Amino acid sequence: MEIHVTYNTTLICLSILIACTASYISLELSRKVTINTGLKSKIWLIGGSLIMGFGIWSMHFVGMMAVHMEMPMEYEFMPLMAAIGASVSGSFVSLYFVSRHILTYYRLLTGSVVLGASIASMHYIGMSAISRVMIIYEPILFTVSIIIAIAASFVSLKIFFDLAVKKHSEHLIFYKGVSSIVMGIGISGMHYTGMLAATFHKDMAPPGSHMEVQTFHWSIFVTLIIFCIQTLLLFSSHADRKFIKQSERIKDNEQRFQSLIVHNIDAIFILSLEGDIISSNHAGEEMISKFGFSMHDWRNYTSLKVKRLFEQVKKDKQAMNSDSDLITEKGQFHLNITLIPVEVNQELDSIYVICKDMTKQYKAEKEIHRMAHYDSLTDLPNRRHAISHLTKVLNREHSLHYNTVVFFLDLNRFKVINDALGHNVGDQLLQFAAKRLSSVVPDNGFIARLGGDEFIIILTDANTGTGEADVLARKIIQKFKKPFKIQDHTLVTSVSIGIAISPKDGTDGLELMKKADMAMYAAKERNKSKYRYYSFSIGNKETVKLNQEMVLREAIENDRFVLHYQPQFSVKKQKMTGAEALIRLVTPDGQLRPPGEFIGVAEETGLIIDIGKWIIDEACKQARIWHDKGYDLSVAINISARQFQSKDLIPLIKDTLNKYQLPPQLLEVEVTESMTMDNLNHSKKVLSSLTELGIRISIDDFGTGHSSLSYLKDFPIHRLKIDKSFIDDIQTHPKSEQITGAIIAMGHQLSLQVIAEGVENAAQKQLLFEKGCDHLQGFFFSRPIPPEQFEQFIIEQPSQ
């Protein structure tokens, strides 16, 4: 006989709620199983299976209680237990698959079938527990319920796995909530589909002898207990998750701290309060090994300074830093040490020591200091060091009333030797000279190289009354009388010395050095192996030079130079063939100053280079103007000694010729004998280069310098210029006449043209004509005149 059944809507909703809650707890349990490892993971797997299984079964049990029949419902005990076992088994399968970390499609499908079968078994075994009722199932709905069970299992396993491996985020709780609703509805759907498939009939068979569960209230109590357990588990899981996160943060911080120590490039030691090393990082172990002792010997090698610092940190409980030296069998090390107190529960526990080996940096700083204060070539103090030392000495002298003597020294002929034999020989000469100077400097003396071939000696606490400065100056001069043997060369040089004394000559270091420098130049002018004291006259002379230099600089900036031209005549052709360009300085008031008044200062200060460039450019420009007007006159220019030694001379002349498109034969270069003799190889190279350009070369002031037949033979020279001093005396001194004749004859023998300068009267002209001189120049023909007057002079010449 069929039994009519009804359903309690409240209990149905309660069962669905229990299903959703069980699903949510299952998701939590799946994460527990996944994030834990080892024994802890196994405990969560077993315990979680029981909790999850009972939760799913409770949904089924409440759903069963939602069914109302015409007769009281009683349940057999053993089928109920079997249903619980099926639910727990299915839960175990689902959690086990999730814990595998990799969920393949085959594993997902297999797990879904097993879990679905377990849930279906739980349901239908639980249905069979109803006493004195025969249940007949409609096949299609029965099959649909099993399919729903498998599909719900498939979705559940997929959701379990995805959320179990998903990293925590602010959206994770929302995902789990939605997923638990989907899973709960799926499980409930399977249950109630199975209920729809069932028709209940009274079983007329007598009741069995097995145990039955009859108490409805006891069932409600069990269900509520399970629901409470689920709720408690839910809150416990949430609290556990917060605890785990906090533990992870603490663990992460601890790992970061340990990583900071372990991977720190600086040595870190943890010291006990007694000063023993408890532990260290790898860098600390390497440092101890480099020092050559063990960690147990640390206290034996610790300096007194560090020990005091250690005690101070213990006392004040504040970090401190200091530099310290450590001396071991492996050598001396320079360390920077930071001591940091470590407190636990407001009690000093240990001391952290951060130790940096600054040995290389210390040596580098020391080397930098040496490079900044010492000369790399001679190992003597340099200019900076000398100025600093002199300043300190003068400050002390001012309070103690001592005398300080400053010697300014310059090697004579050094530039000639350096240019002729090369920088290697020049450097060695400076090194040997430095050693000789150092050997005579007394204990109260200080020596430094200022640069180039200049040195300075400073005598402190000097007794000027006993002639201490004179004695030292003479010793230095005597030392340099002995030649230097360098490589295969025997080199002779001397030294010029200038002396200034404080406080007589000043109390400022730079002022004393400047005055000693002035005195040195005065000594060099008088005799290149002398010494001179600074005096007012020397200072006044230098002041005049300084004023002249300022005038020259102002003239260069404002283009206040002009060239005047003095005609040169051919004796044979009886006509003008060229001119010599002679520079004049135009003063602000319009007066002209001849070169003799400023060329010396220009040469000494180096301004002659700029002036020489202007002369070359202006002379070439004027020669081109005359050439365009049909006046084929060569223009002779004088080259200074400093410009002759310059590497820029040849390119400058070449560029200027190209600039004005001037035929090179219209330019003549005059050089003196002395400048060509300073460096024969360089001179030959320069003169040959000029000749290759097509420029004619004249030797100016011939007969007054280092006259040598060898250089007349070797150098590409075109003309000799007899010095004016011979022409002045040619009428009154027979020897001057004979020398003049000899120069002319020698020049002709060497196929050289000869020109005489300074011809001032007809008698001199006639005498030179008789001796066969080729060209004449002097006031007899014309003074040096501006270009405009020179052109008029050309026009007035009948031969032109």
UniProtKB/Swiss-Prot annotation:
EAL domain ranges (all copies): 545-798
Pfam families, per database record: EAL, GGDEF, MHYT
Gene Ontology molecular function terms on file: cyclic-guanylate-specific phosphodiesterase activity
Keyword Membrane: yes
Claim: Membrane is one of the keywords in the record: yes
InterPro entries with a match to the protein in the record: Biofilm_reg_signaling (IPR052155), EAL_dom (IPR001633), EAL_sf (IPR035919), GGDEF_dom (IPR000160), MHYT_dom (IPR005330), Nucleotide_cyclase (IPR029787), PAS-like_dom_sf (IPR035965), Rev_trsase/Diguanyl_cyclase (IPR043128)
Chain segments annotated as transmembrane: 5-27, 44-66, 76-98, 103-125, 135-157, 178-200, 215-237
Start and end residues of each MHYT domain: 7-201
Membrane topology: Multi-pass membrane protein
UniProt entry keywords in alphabetical sequence: Cell membrane, Membrane, Transmembrane, Transmembrane helix
Gene3D superfamilies attached to this UniProt entry: 3.30.70.270, EAL domain, PAS domain
Residues of the PAS domain: 255-319
Organism domain of life: Bacteria
Main location as per UniProt: membrane
Disruption phenotype: Cells do not display any phenotype.
Domain GGDEF: 402-536
Location in or out of the cell: Cell membrane
SMART domains per UniProt: EAL (SM00052), GGDEF (SM00267)
CC annotations in GO: plasma membrane
Protein's job: Probable signaling protein whose physiological role is not yet known.
The protein, known as: Signaling protein YkoW
Organism the protein comes from: Bacillus subtilis (strain 168)
Name of the gene: ykoW
